[in-house]
Amino acid sequence: MKFGLTLLRVIVGVLFFGHGTQKLYGWFGGHGIEGTAGFFESIGLKPGRKHATAAGAAETGGGALLALGFLTPAAAASLIGVMSTAIRKVHAKNGPWAGDGGYEYNLALIAIMVTLADLGPGHVSLDHALGIEVKGPLVALLALAAGIGGATVLTEAGSQDTEPAPAPTDTPEPAEAAATV
Protein backbone atom coordinates (compact mmCIF):
# COMPACT_ATOMS: atom_id res chain seq x y z
CA MET A 1 0.00 0.00 0.00
CA LYS A 2 2.74 2.47 0.93
CA PHE A 3 4.64 1.92 -2.32
CA GLY A 4 1.46 2.20 -4.38
CA LEU A 5 0.41 5.41 -2.65
CA THR A 6 3.83 6.97 -3.21
CA LEU A 7 3.90 5.88 -6.85
CA LEU A 8 0.43 7.30 -7.49
CA ARG A 9 1.22 10.60 -5.76
CA VAL A 10 4.55 11.13 -7.52
CA ILE A 11 3.33 10.23 -11.01
CA VAL A 12 0.17 12.34 -10.79
CA GLY A 13 2.14 15.23 -9.26
CA VAL A 14 4.76 15.16 -12.02
CA LEU A 15 2.05 15.04 -14.70
CA PHE A 16 0.27 18.05 -13.19
CA PHE A 17 3.60 19.88 -12.96
CA GLY A 18 4.16 19.20 -16.67
CA HIS A 19 0.70 20.47 -17.60
CA GLY A 20 1.27 23.63 -15.60
CA THR A 21 4.56 24.35 -17.35
CA GLN A 22 2.85 23.79 -20.70
CA LYS A 23 0.44 26.59 -19.80
CA LEU A 24 3.02 28.94 -18.32
CA TYR A 25 6.10 28.41 -20.49
CA GLY A 26 5.09 26.34 -23.50
CA TRP A 27 7.23 23.41 -22.32
CA PHE A 28 6.48 19.84 -23.39
CA GLY A 29 4.58 20.96 -26.49
CA GLY A 30 2.33 23.41 -24.66
CA HIS A 31 1.05 26.73 -25.96
CA GLY A 32 2.56 28.96 -23.29
CA ILE A 33 0.82 31.75 -21.49
CA GLU A 34 -0.38 33.60 -24.60
CA GLY A 35 -1.87 30.52 -26.27
CA THR A 36 -3.49 29.40 -23.04
CA ALA A 37 -4.81 32.91 -22.42
CA GLY A 38 -6.44 32.93 -25.85
CA PHE A 39 -8.10 29.60 -25.17
CA PHE A 40 -9.32 30.76 -21.77
CA GLU A 41 -10.79 33.91 -23.33
CA SER A 42 -12.61 31.71 -25.89
CA ILE A 43 -14.34 29.75 -23.11
CA GLY A 44 -15.37 32.89 -21.22
CA LEU A 45 -12.57 33.13 -18.65
CA LYS A 46 -11.62 36.79 -18.90
CA PRO A 47 -9.08 38.21 -18.65
CA GLY A 48 -7.55 35.13 -20.16
CA ARG A 49 -3.97 35.91 -19.15
CA LYS A 50 -4.83 36.14 -15.45
CA HIS A 51 -6.82 32.90 -15.54
CA ALA A 52 -4.10 31.13 -17.55
CA THR A 53 -1.48 32.29 -15.05
CA ALA A 54 -3.61 31.12 -12.12
CA ALA A 55 -4.29 27.72 -13.70
CA GLY A 56 -0.67 27.25 -14.71
CA ALA A 57 0.58 28.24 -11.26
CA ALA A 58 -1.95 25.95 -9.56
CA GLU A 59 -0.90 23.00 -11.71
CA THR A 60 2.83 23.69 -11.52
CA GLY A 61 2.89 24.47 -7.81
CA GLY A 62 0.26 21.93 -6.84
CA GLY A 63 1.93 19.26 -8.93
CA ALA A 64 5.35 19.95 -7.40
CA LEU A 65 3.92 19.91 -3.86
CA LEU A 66 2.05 16.70 -4.60
CA ALA A 67 5.10 14.97 -6.08
CA LEU A 68 7.14 15.93 -3.02
CA GLY A 69 4.35 14.98 -0.64
CA PHE A 70 4.48 18.44 0.94
CA LEU A 71 1.37 20.26 2.16
CA THR A 72 -0.59 17.52 0.46
CA PRO A 73 -4.14 18.74 1.29
CA ALA A 74 -3.33 22.23 -0.06
CA ALA A 75 -1.85 20.71 -3.21
CA ALA A 76 -4.95 18.54 -3.58
CA ALA A 77 -7.27 21.55 -3.18
CA SER A 78 -5.45 23.57 -5.85
CA LEU A 79 -5.52 20.68 -8.32
CA ILE A 80 -9.17 19.92 -7.56
CA GLY A 81 -9.87 23.56 -8.38
CA VAL A 82 -8.21 23.32 -11.79
CA MET A 83 -9.96 20.06 -12.64
CA SER A 84 -13.38 21.29 -11.50
CA THR A 85 -12.93 24.37 -13.68
CA ALA A 86 -12.01 22.16 -16.64
CA ILE A 87 -15.15 20.11 -16.05
CA ARG A 88 -17.36 23.16 -15.67
CA LYS A 89 -16.03 25.25 -18.55
CA VAL A 90 -15.04 22.59 -21.11
CA HIS A 91 -16.14 19.01 -20.49
CA ALA A 92 -19.51 18.90 -18.67
CA LYS A 93 -21.53 19.67 -21.79
CA ASN A 94 -20.05 16.58 -23.48
CA GLY A 95 -21.16 14.04 -20.88
CA PRO A 96 -18.90 11.73 -18.91
CA TRP A 97 -16.94 9.85 -21.56
CA ALA A 98 -13.51 11.14 -22.57
CA GLY A 99 -13.96 9.83 -26.12
CA ASP A 100 -16.70 12.41 -26.53
CA GLY A 101 -14.68 15.18 -24.88
CA GLY A 102 -16.29 14.45 -21.51
CA TYR A 103 -15.13 14.78 -17.93
CA GLU A 104 -14.28 11.23 -16.81
CA TYR A 105 -10.50 11.85 -16.72
CA ASN A 106 -10.89 15.09 -14.75
CA LEU A 107 -13.26 13.39 -12.32
CA ALA A 108 -10.80 10.53 -11.82
CA LEU A 109 -8.06 13.05 -11.00
CA ILE A 110 -10.37 14.76 -8.49
CA ALA A 111 -11.02 11.36 -6.89
CA ILE A 112 -7.26 10.78 -6.64
CA MET A 113 -6.79 14.18 -4.97
CA VAL A 114 -9.57 13.48 -2.45
CA THR A 115 -8.07 10.06 -1.74
CA LEU A 116 -4.59 11.51 -1.15
CA ALA A 117 -6.02 14.18 1.17
CA ASP A 118 -7.81 11.41 3.07
CA LEU A 119 -4.95 8.87 3.29
CA GLY A 120 -2.08 11.35 3.37
CA PRO A 121 0.98 11.28 1.13
CA GLY A 122 2.56 8.17 2.62
CA HIS A 123 5.82 7.63 4.46
CA VAL A 124 8.07 8.65 1.58
CA SER A 125 7.07 12.32 1.65
CA LEU A 126 8.13 15.66 3.06
CA ASP A 127 4.93 15.79 5.11
CA HIS A 128 5.94 12.57 6.87
CA ALA A 129 9.58 13.64 7.28
CA LEU A 130 8.50 16.96 8.83
CA GLY A 131 5.83 15.42 11.03
CA ILE A 132 2.94 17.04 9.17
CA GLU A 133 0.06 14.63 9.77
CA VAL A 134 -2.92 16.47 8.29
CA LYS A 135 -5.15 13.86 6.69
CA GLY A 136 -8.45 12.04 7.08
CA PRO A 137 -12.03 12.22 5.82
CA LEU A 138 -12.63 15.76 7.12
CA VAL A 139 -9.42 17.00 5.52
CA ALA A 140 -10.44 15.33 2.25
CA LEU A 141 -13.86 17.00 2.33
CA LEU A 142 -12.28 20.37 3.14
CA ALA A 143 -9.84 20.00 0.22
CA LEU A 144 -12.74 19.11 -2.07
CA ALA A 145 -14.84 22.05 -0.86
CA ALA A 146 -11.92 24.50 -1.04
CA GLY A 147 -10.98 23.38 -4.54
CA ILE A 148 -14.49 23.48 -5.96
CA GLY A 149 -15.46 26.60 -4.01
CA GLY A 150 -12.36 28.54 -5.00
CA ALA A 151 -12.70 27.50 -8.62
CA THR A 152 -16.36 28.49 -8.68
CA VAL A 153 -15.59 31.96 -7.32
CA LEU A 154 -12.81 32.46 -9.86
CA THR A 155 -14.79 31.17 -12.84
CA GLU A 156 -17.81 33.26 -11.92
CA ALA A 157 -15.61 36.33 -11.60
CA GLY A 158 -14.08 35.43 -14.96
CA SER A 159 -17.47 34.99 -16.58
CA GLN A 160 -18.70 38.46 -15.77
CA ASP A 161 -19.18 40.85 -18.65
CA THR A 162 -16.12 43.08 -18.67
CA GLU A 163 -17.22 45.64 -21.22
CA PRO A 164 -16.46 49.22 -20.18
CA ALA A 165 -19.25 51.44 -18.93
CA PRO A 166 -20.75 53.71 -21.59
CA ALA A 167 -19.18 57.14 -21.89
CA PRO A 168 -21.17 60.03 -20.41
CA THR A 169 -23.21 62.04 -22.89
CA ASP A 170 -24.12 65.71 -23.04
CA THR A 171 -27.81 64.82 -23.16
CA PRO A 172 -29.55 66.22 -20.08
CA GLU A 173 -31.13 63.80 -17.65
CA PRO A 174 -34.96 63.70 -17.75
CA ALA A 175 -35.22 65.59 -14.45
CA GLU A 176 -32.93 68.35 -15.74
CA ALA A 177 -34.92 68.60 -18.97
CA ALA A 178 -38.20 68.91 -17.05
CA ALA A 179 -36.79 71.66 -14.83
CA THR A 180 -35.92 73.82 -17.83
CA VAL A 181 -39.38 73.66 -19.38
Where are these regions (language model features)?
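Generic beta-strand or strand-like secondary-structure segments
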Residues: 39, 65-66, 83
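Solvent-exposed, well-ordered loop and adjacent helix/strand elements within mature globular domains
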Residues: 15, 21-55
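Short hydrophobic "helix-edge" motifs at membrane interfaces and signal-peptide entry regions
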Residues: 49, 62, 109-111
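Hydrophobic, membrane-inserted alpha-helices
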Residues: 57-66, 90-91
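Alpha-helix C-terminal capping segments
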Residues: 68-70
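Extended, low-polarity transmembrane helix blocks
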Residues: 1-27, 72-181
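Membrane-interface junctions
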Residues: 46, 60, 132-135
